[in-house]
Amino acid sequence: MRNIFFKTAVCLITAIISFSLSASQREWKDAPGGLPYYKYTGSSDADPSFLIGNSHIKVKTHLDGIYEMISGERCWARFNADPVRPDYGKNRATVYLNKKRINLVGPGSLATVPGKCEVYSGAGFVRYDYDLGNGIKCSRMISVMPSQTPADTAPLFLVTLTFENTGSAARNLSYDEALSPYFVQASHQLIHEAERPLRYNMSTDISFRCIKASFGPVPQDFVPLAVPQNRAKDEFAPQSIFLYSANAFLVVNEGELKASIEDFKVRARKKHTFHIVIGFSGDDNKGLAEAVIKKAEDSQFGAFSSMWKKHLPDFSAEKNKDVRNELYRSAYSIEASMVYSDYFKETFIPGKFLYASRFGENISNSDHINAALQACYTNPSLAKSIIRYVMKQTSFDGIIPDSNKGFGYISSDQYTHNLTQLEVLNVLAEYLMRTGDYEFLDEWLTVYPMERGEVQSVKSIIERYFIYIRDKAYVSATMSSMQAAVLPKFLDQMKKSGKLSAEFIDAFQKYTDKAVEHFNSRNEYASADIQYLLESKLLTNSQKRDILDEAMNKGSVDMRAIPGLSSFDGIEASSLFRTLILKNDASDDADIMDAWTIYSYFRIKE
């Protein structure tokens, strides 16, 4: 049984991974006075996904209207998972018109019928526009608010239903919005339910206008139970979820949390709108839901479109519409994928959201820290949180693990030799250059494992990075290129800060001089290291030109080359940037290259 399930799951995952939402499947438009959005124009046979979210909730919606309610705040998990289909959810939206039941979402629903449904997506929203027949139009829109701060935001989404009667006679309708709570940890979704280490019993509680569903872990094998705030591979304290509606009759029926709005009338040439809130449970679900509904805008481009416009970087000065659309898409994708870690108490940007949400592993700290480069320009508090997130995972000897999984769990084999320390120093230097926040160097951080409560100063962590880099027995060509670009830049910021000891500055200066001497002694430079070579102040423009030409001939130039290229040839950097961004065919799921795109844009502007 397990083998059959696993093979089926792998086939489904492979099919989903192979599909990406290309530029040709988007018809971009500009909302009046707002942000760009697009209409999906691809085949209904495909299964693209549209990610909306903030640091506390992810809603991955499918073309057929099914959504996955996802969180990475603790273990990456789905809270309305389909029991038999990985990477899919279980929810229902049903209209009753003229005694006829019309399913709006799911396989075989109206959402999959050509000509009966159009799908639009933009910053913070996905909208499905239906033609129900008999002169009745229906819009079902899912919206999320942006994160107010990296750690603070509303962990919920708003479902806005609008029925419009274009006919000459009033119509009576009924509507159900429901989801089926079923908790599945991402790392377990390819394991048959009977063979997972834990299963989860659901319990529900109905109060005024709210239904709450909670999940209790039940071991199915020998699994030492963990304290909820202690690191663990498996989830022992899943978040609870809730559904709120001021207009509906709420009921738990056959495992569904259901909001039913029965027999309402839509008069001729009139509209009828109502809201349903679904999210992660807190101290006052009703109060939070009502506060969010009050902030909802009467806009078909997202219930919080004005908030998103204010929150995202302003790219309106970009004259090339296609480039501008991609900039907004990349910036929004970063915001939609970033996640607050309850274990580390910091927010980070997953380098690969698809991987994290599918397999439950945050890969990799190298990607996470590089994603902070763009945040130095767009959201310095987020950049700082990412730096802290990576620093908190550092071992006593200065090694940074490649990744973590579960609830803050880092296995011993993740502490491998890598070059992430140099990347942290690079981002820290960039952050200090942009903000002048030298007081950050005096801060103390609680370090891994967090439950022990051990604190270390940022300065001591920096010193351990330096010792680790200095004492490496072998310096590769890539490491040499990185050192030439990073060490002088970082040393300059440490001197300006006045926070590090004279002994440290002297030792760092000596090592930097040695690294520069080693770099200058090289006769060849690998085009694979182009992002560091172009950033280095030790090469002439002529040398950089040769390196760039070689890399372009090999087809190995991507967005990571742009920041360094901008330092010696701004016109070419701008041209190459626009060429690369228009080749971007990535899906809406945020990727590290989205972060490099935004960072490159701001570097070019300097």
Residues covered by each model-derived region:
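Low-complexity, Ser/Thr/Pro/Gly-enriched N-terminal "stalk/linker" regions
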Residues: 24, 301-359, 385, 389
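Active-site core of glycosidic bond-cleaving carbohydrate-active enzymes
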Residues: 364-379, 459, 478-496, 506, ...
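Beta-strand-rich recognition/accessory modules
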Residues: 232-303
